[in-house]
Amino acid sequence: MAAKEVKFNSDARDRMLKGVNILADAVKVTLGPKGRNVVIDKSFGAPRITKDGVSVAKEIELSDKFENMGAQMVREVASRTNDEAGDGTTTATVLAQAIVREGLKAVAAGMNPMDLKRGIDVATAKVVEAIKSAARPVNDSSEVAQVGTISANGESFIGQQIAEAMQRVGNEGVITVEENKGMETEVEVVEGMQFDRGYLSPYFVTNADKMIAELEDAYILLHEKKLSSLQPMVPLLESVIQSQKPLLIVAEDVEGEALATLVVNKLRGGLKIAAVKAPGFGDRRKAMLQDIAILTGGQVISEDLGMKLENVTIDMLGRAKKVSINKDNTTIVDGAGEKAEIEARVSQIRQQIEETTSDYDREKLQERVAKLAGGVAVIRVGGMTEIEVKERKDRVDDALNATRAAVQEGIVVGGGVALVQGAKVLEGLSGANSDQDAGIAIIRRALEAPMRQIAENAGVDGAVVAGKVRESSDKAFGFNAQTEEYGDMFKFGVIDPAKVVRTALEDAASVAGLLITTEAMIAEKPEPKAPAGGMPDMGGMGGMM
């Protein structure tokens, strides 16, 4: 086991604070509409340019082990806020730095760290309550656009694109962000249910120019197992031919004789038909087939339920106004399912989302909800260079997370005003002793840190701005750093999601409280470097005359 180095008391805390400051100082330059960029060197490829706090925090690794521990703890604040709210990472980092700095001063003055932490926890809970009660719901898409714009560092175009995407797929819809090959940033919406399985044979194509198979007012057969022979379903196929409607077969696979027979019938013009593989694998495949059945008002033909293909009648099939299939995807639009049943299925999947602990499962379940409830939107981010596209994609991701958070828990005044107003609920609040009172005072002072930083990044004195806002009785009064004027922040369109502000404060106070109560730090001792090798011994050069 390698030797360890141990630091105690103020020596440990000073080294830790130094690490906290290095990381927080690098992150906080990005805060606000006039925040600056940070350039990050990459071991391969071009450097990365970003204004995303968590991206900066994740890149910082210090050579001094004790300083690095402090930095990593604050990095944890940014990561947790990012995971929970998707935005507000820089605000959380600035708050954590302010709480740690003030807290360590109080510890150095002889106060009890545990009582300070209790005071910090009491004050944080009180302010979080105030933020929740001050939140108001998002009323229209212009407010969604404003939230997105603020989070994208003032780029209104990004805010508008996100508002458009949310309007088209609904608040429950899935919105994904991808890099675009071109210059433009655009929104593409896939309505209906789409899954990533294409036609099993190009002979099913009905539109040769676009290489897609389109079926209008189609029947849909959902089969859980492989189809290798069509013999059992001849009566069903005859019923479909009589109805003169096209048929889509979704099965685990359609192979051999069955596929050949379908293709021959299609080419002879007797049967408008297409076949695709069922989406997903294992249990997820069963669940997705059931989703399609509910959406189209059909039944999944499953041997588990004792259903056989020879007994299937035409009324067991699903129906859809339109089915479009290309070589990679199948889209079912306007299924004939009952609205009440679809809503029941959606709430059932939502229940599973709440209960699951796996991020991957949660993401897949959310996709299923979106496909049943609204649709899927893709924001394709463009730019002049690859570096610009990546930087912009970071901001679109942040803005998208912020707007989702706003829809969930409502909005509050932006620009750090919600935190300064929240501090007013701490007036008159006292703890069990004077050290707890000091902890409450630490939070009251720290809550002004984000507003001060936003102002300072805009080249204005932060103390003056914080003082003016603190003295105002108008809860929406604040400083718009973009235009450098004071006034009603709601009218300026400077708003923040309540969830982001709340999460930033909770995570910052949680980690900062742990740092303040640190009394000893242990790290591996660096290995002593081996001395540089000298010239090898030549063994004497005797005998020379």
UniProtKB/Swiss-Prot annotation:
UniProt KW Transcription keyword: no
CC annotations in GO: cytoplasm
InterPro entries: Chaperonin_Cpn60_CS, Cpn60/GroEL, Cpn60/GroEL/TCP-1, GroEL-like_apical_dom_sf, GROEL-like_equatorial_sf, TCP-1-like_intermed_sf
Positions contributing to ATP binding: T30, L31, G32, P33, K51, D87, G88, T89, T90, T91, G415, D496
UniProt entry keywords in alphabetical sequence: ATP-binding, Chaperone, Cytoplasm, Isomerase, Nucleotide-binding
Location within or outside the cell: Cytoplasm
SUPFAM superfamilies tied to this protein: GroEL apical domain-like, GroEL equatorial domain-like, GroEL-intermediate domain like
Protein's GO biological process: protein refolding
Pfam families in UniProt: Cpn60_TCP1
Catalytic activity of the protein: ATP + H2O + a folded polypeptide = ADP + phosphate + an unfolded polypeptide
Domain of life of the source: Bacteria
Compositional bias per record (Gly residues), positions renumbered to this chain: 536-545
Enzyme Commission number(s) from the entry: 5.6.1.7
The keyword S-adenosyl-L-methionine is assigned to this record: no
Region (Disordered): 526-545
A GO term, aspect molecular function: unfolded protein binding
Chief place of localization: cytoplasm
Enzyme class label: isomerase
Record's function text: Together with its co-chaperonin GroES, plays an essential role in assisting protein folding. The GroEL-GroES system forms a nano-cage that allows encapsulation of the non-native substrate proteins and provides a physical environment optimized to promote and accelerate protein folding.
Assembly: Forms a cylinder of 14 subunits composed of two heptameric rings stacked back-to-back. Interacts with the co-chaperonin GroES.
Family of this protein: Belongs to the chaperonin (HSP60) family.
Protein name: Chaperonin GroEL
Native source organism of the sequence: Paracoccus denitrificans
